[in-house]
């Protein structure tokens, strides 16, 4: 015993024991980067790195698509990114089998270090990253009540007026392009979600401390941090100290967490104002999401959602709606600016259906070619080319392949939407494919029910699949199609003089939280035959109906 004690307290032990611990952790890490037993097939990787250096850093979905040709698109593709297990689904048939038929297992989210340890911790929840639970079920139910298909009808005056307001703002900035045009579009895209969650427009919440510019900065920083990062791939990086700038991300994470909490408080403050007006019996037809939560918390003593959850819910609804909607609408504008004949065809349908008058929401169901254009945009340039990763809640076996619990399951939307097996000329932008076949499939694909079932195809996978499909997809489609129809009625969409529009994936797009164009280099010019008064009159007419729903009088609650 004496000899052992001497070893323990010897000077050499202060070197060797930490070294042994370090070597032990390194060995565990290297073992974790190896492929699990019976893991789905995939390319051989390197110890400590896995397949990390083999995957395209900018557009990883392209690499996965190439590997699918080697291992089969209907076979799950096993990939190792450092210590992280990744399984890629490269066909619609695989998505159906795992995300839809086995939805009870494949509806969780992968554990992510930054999310779970630094930003959300135990007191902050984000529905998009939550595992299946009664909390998530209740959240999605409340969301669908307020933004689902039935709610869209009740909110129609708001969609109409906010889009009419967009036309006026575009008219007031005739040379807006790039970031200036984005700022106008973002205000419009935030309006319906903001009114829906707290009863206030985003540009009229200054008295609650809310500013659109600060919100966008917070949202962008948040999106950067919550993506899988080095701390997930190389766990030892989590323990780096903050001095000498070795873990600068820790300070960023604290700042983002604080900004998300503050923004949620601002939304909640606006909702409390509407709640008070409703309680006073003011004439307000629309009870916002947070106002409803506050009422139920009071009346039912319902503690399912804390006040922090409520504010965080508002932040995520508005943030998600803004980022993806801006990407989709920007792509649509760029495509139409680049192809004047296509633009005129879509406009002609809008004018024919509306009888030359300003198009309204009731016209949307008759805009068949415009909807085909919408579907082709999502097929050709999906803004979520890898979706949002799912994770199995338990170990699972599929066709003899073992998929460990917690594995990141990626739906390769890009590869599915560009499959030569399913689409004629998949690299070409052809809206007519959705007029010839309801799913846009090849001309030799029949409409036979058995054939469609075997193909497992959908119009688009851009909104996700299974139990985690985007609950806001109906609202987004309604809002953006209405916006497109009204913009085409009022404006010509043109490329800036002397500039080319680049729609190439490799040179014209950036992959961040959404796949989006590098630059929104278009300008909107008032069409011949349209006047400023036309647009002002349209907004005045639609605002009257919106004000009645929202209980406004001179911008205040009646």
UniProtKB/Swiss-Prot annotation:
| Gene3D superfamilies named among the record's database cross-references | Cytochrome P450
Q: Which GO terms describe its cellular component?
A: membrane
Query: Recorded E.C. number(s)?
Result: 1.-.-.-
Q: What is its main location?
A: membrane
- Give the domain of life: Eukaryota
**Subcellular location per the Swiss-Prot or TrEMBL entry:** Membrane
Part of which pathway? Secondary metabolite biosynthesis
The UniProt entry's sequence similarity note says: Belongs to the cytochrome P450 family.
Q: What does this protein do?
A: Cytochrome P450 monooxygenase; part of the gene cluster that mediates the biosynthesis of gregatin A, a fungal polyketide featuring an alkylated furanone core. The PKS grgA synthesizes C11 and C4 polyketide chains in the presence and absence of the trans-enoyl reductase grgB, respectively. The polyketide transferase grgF is then responsible for the fusion of the two carbon chains to produce the furanone skeleton of gregatin A. Next, the cytochrome P450 monooxygenase grgG performs the oxidative cyclization to furnish the gregatin scaffold and leads to the formation of desmethylgregatin A.
Protein's name according to its UniProt entry: Cytochrome P450 monooxygenase grgG
Q: Which organism is it from?
A: Penicillium sp
Q: Which gene encodes it?
A: grgG
